[in-house]
Amino acid sequence: MNRAFCLLARSRRFPRVPSAGAVLSGEAATLPRCAPNVVRMASQNSFRIEYDTFGELKVPTDKYYGAQTVRSTMNFKIGGATERMPIPVIKAFGILKRAAAEVNQEYGLDPKIASAIMKAADEVAEGKLNDHFPLVVWQTGSGTQTNMNVNEVISNRAIEMLGGELGSKKPVHPNDHVNKSQSSNDTFPTAMHIAAALEVHQVLLPGLQKLHDALSAKSKEFAQVIKIGRTHTQDAVPLTLGQEFSGYVQQVQYAMERIKAAMPRIYELAAGGTAVGTGLNTRIGFAEKVAAKVAALTGLPFVTAPNKFEALAAHDALVELSGAMNTTACSLMKIANDIRFLGSGPRSGLGELILPENEPGSSIMPGKVNPTQCEAMTMVAAQVMGNHVAVTVGGSNGHFELNVFKPMMIKNVLHSARLLGDASVSFTENCVVGIQANTERINKLMNESLMLVTALNPHIGYDKAAKIAKTAHKNGSTLKETAIELGYLTAEQFDEWVKPKDMLGPK
């Protein structure tokens, strides 16, 4: 039979039938009109025929997506598999489509169809159908192709559940049923917000909390370790190592607070705005009901956006969230840099901290160990800063009633949230919890510091104190020796007035 089909195809100059892999990579072609039995034979091999408004397309028989998804793979061969739409967006779409089906059933959608849509949407939300979403981020700026990818997958999976034929659009139509009362223009931004909120709550905030708690524990552990401070990378007056770490604790605390402060706008959903924000082709109450369903499904306080025109045309909420993550990246860059510099050495650096040794550090220098967790964290911070630039550009390009940088924006927001959350956990578990204070080195550096002379200001004045420091530095002598030689004070006075433990706060 296969040979007969090949001969028939050759005699009628039919195009070569691509494999499923070729279709996925974009090598799909339209099939000329031919006898039904020929189409059936083709379907029994590696593909089936589906239609969109532009015509017929070959769809791999083992995939639930349809013609519009295949056409997108043909038109947007950009980046390959590594640039696919983030899975959190796909899962968020599953949540949204289930919620919409529930509400549509309340408004009269056939319960049998609604139930099948809900079951298929649940599979999408649970990640069971991830292999059926091949589209890349770099597509239409509204995310229309991905919305249709979701509609097609849910439609065909629902059809299969109901015993129908894949690609027939019966009894479950991707547009008329799965996308009922919806537009890509309001569903994609809704999925963006759902995905961002879930990533923040499941990955980012838990990671930052773990880091915060570990730094807080170290701050308490190092509360009695007095060390020399540094400003402008030069010696300054003393503080405790615990005080130094308390600054890091507060930075991470503020980071979490900034992120949480941005979330109320993320919880506002565009669903119900349809094409331009007017809500055309929806029912009164649809938007509110969908938001309530999404809130129930996720356990997060989602509400309908008070102004759908803003929700479709601007994504300031995502720019705001990205900005909070950008600030977090700045904080983590500073913390990681401080820790790796304080741990520099082991013999030729500052050496005040002893960092965990996790792996060999050099392919040529035996015994070398590097602050790799600090380096990973700083690279993550740099990437997040770059992501924020892209999100900012995207957010500023909402034209009239629609922002058309949606896929790029959510890709970068999710990337930042995931990186910061994961890096915080890695940095905590593989570095922070194992940090030790090198008290011998800390005491040596503090006792040699010329800035202890600052304690003499109230007793002998700034000018004399400065002369003591400069003379001691020039002669290589100690502050005490120099102060006595200059006749500014006695040994007893120096010992009474220059006590690092008395220089740690106001009197």
Swiss-Prot record:
Modified residues (N6-acetyllysine): K58, K63, K77, K91, K112, K119, K210, K220, K289, K499
Entry keyword Cytoplasm: yes
InterPro entries: Fum_hydII, Fumarase/histidase_N, Fumarase_C_C, Fumarate_lyase_CS, Fumarate_lyase_fam, Fumarate_lyase_N, L-Aspartase-like
Recorded GO MF terms: fumarate hydratase activity
Modified residues (N6-succinyllysine): K58, K63, K77, K112, K119, K220, K289, K464, K470
Misc remark: There are 2 substrate-binding sites: the catalytic A site, and the non-catalytic B site that may play a role in the transfer of substrate or product between the active site and the solvent. Alternatively, the B site may bind allosteric effectors.
GO biological-process terms attached to the record: arginine metabolic process; DNA damage response; DNA repair; fumarate metabolic process; homeostasis of number of cells within a tissue; malate metabolic process; positive regulation of cold-induced thermogenesis; positive regulation of double-strand break repair via nonhomologous end joining
Quaternary structure, from the entry: Homotetramer. Interacts with H2AZ1.
Protein name: Fumarate hydratase, mitochondrial
Residues with the Phosphothreonine modification: T82, T233
Similarity section: Belongs to the class-II fumarase/aspartase family. Fumarase subfamily.
GO cellular component, one term: cytosol
Positions of substrate binding: 142-144, 173-176, 183-185, 231, 363, 368-370
Database matches in Pfam families: FumaraseC_C, Lyase_1
Positions carrying Phosphoserine: S363
EC number(s) recorded for this UniProt protein: 4.2.1.2
Taxonomic source organism: Rattus norvegicus
Keywords associated with the record: Acetylation, Chromosome, Cytoplasm, DNA damage, DNA repair, Lyase, Mitochondrion, Nucleus, Phosphoprotein, Transit peptide, Tricarboxylic acid cycle
